[in-house]
Amino acid sequence: MHLRKWAGVTTLVAAMGCCYAEASTPRVILVQPSGSQVPANLLRISIRFAAQVEGPVLPRIALLRADGSEIQEPFLEQELWSPDGNVLTIMMHPSRVKSGTNARAALGPILSVGEEVALAINGYPIKRWRIGPNDEAGPVTAAWRVSAVLPKSRQPLVVTLDEPIDGRDAGYLGIADAGGRRVAGRASLAVGESAWAFTPNAPWRAGEYKLIVRSTLEDPAGNRLGSRFETPIDSPPGPAADAVVRFAVFSRRSRAPR
């Protein structure tokens, strides 16, 4: 990897999040986390390809520092593919993410606060990040903000999260009506996975609703609702439980003061 390659594609990466450097490099549609900053204890990365990729991919992937040098042994040697074969999830080596391990003592942490790194395929960067502080707490649903939507519309409901969540976890949130029936619709993540948007298949009806969040929802550092990825042995996490965020759909007229 040479600095020439880094400098030659950074503008494209910043604008599009992917590159098409050469014919042998598989076409990348999206890399998650998709934001510009990730925590130093980042646990996983997902890459969506335009089509299925033949052969092992992990040997072709590297993490590069700003000077072009390669970070040594950052990944767990396992390729986790989606059922359609288009999305590859890569795990950062947990023994180097967690503190107090032999691997971390020998090789050091994978990422350091303040540096910039690039994820590369065949030596060409496909995504850059700035490294921020460790994320040591899971998502806090009490801090989420739910947008207002109007009845008789299919207006998207947007939930602003307190932090980014894992890019593969959009389906870990769902909407139920007052009778507990699941509301059918399409969910997606936006704004660097820090917002969840839901568009119902049928128009909203006025009334009470619940946003149900699975206990296994994670942030990019592997922290879950009410628990941390790195938990002391003498302080095990409590039992996992789904979270509920209540909201209501009302017309503008019913909201107006009397």
Q: PLM features: residue spans?
A:
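Detector for methionine-enriched segments
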Residues: 1, 16, 91-92
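Bacterial N-terminal signal peptides that target proteins for export
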Residues: 1-10
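Bacterial N-terminal signal peptides
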Residues: 9-17
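Acidic, low-complexity Ser/Thr/Gly/Pro-rich repeat segments typical of extracellular/periplasmic
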Residues: 22-258
